[in-house]
Amino acid sequence: MIINNLQEFYRLLLPNAPLISIDYGSKKIGIAISNQERNIAMPLNIITEASKKAIIASLLEKIEQYKACGIVIGLPIDMSGMQTEQSAIVIKFAEELTKSINLPIYLQDERLTTKAANNFLKSFGIKRKERNNNDDAVAASMILETVLNSINKL
């Protein structure tokens, strides 16, 4: 189920279980995971499967492997706060994901996270090709970190 309120999302989470975060892109999907205490977000991997069915299967595998209790998906919003064409694609994906798993899903504004992730990796001297291969997982961890920080203030 897609939850639009962070307090409601938090209320539905199991104690001592991690969250998974998704940075959903048209070519690749970044995945991040929190620790069980939900105070640290870490990049996990990139999914490059072509079909939604394969993407969802990969996600379900990670959710089961890490025993995640909730999902955070980055929602592309333009700089004026409006949803974009990509927002509709992400929302549709989230709706499809709800058919395969019964976990709360929270959509988090992801403005500028991929750019911030790329700049973060660049600051460590990582070459462009490697940055482009990893920036979506780092962006997913930044999206998740935003939610974790907000949850820990509740």
Curated annotation (Swiss-Prot):
This is Putative pre-16S rRNA nuclease. Coiled coil: none annotated. It is found in: Cytoplasm. The keyword Nuclease applies. The keyword Oxidoreductase does not apply. GO terms for biological process: rRNA 5'-end processing. It comes from Rickettsia bellii (strain OSU 85-389). GO terms for cellular component: cytosol. InterPro entries: RNaseH-like_sf, YqgF, YqgF/RNaseH-like_dom, YqgF/RNaseH-like_dom_sf. Belongs to the YqgF nuclease family. HAMAP family: Nuclease_YqgF. CDD domains: YqgF (cd16964). SMART domains: YqgFc.
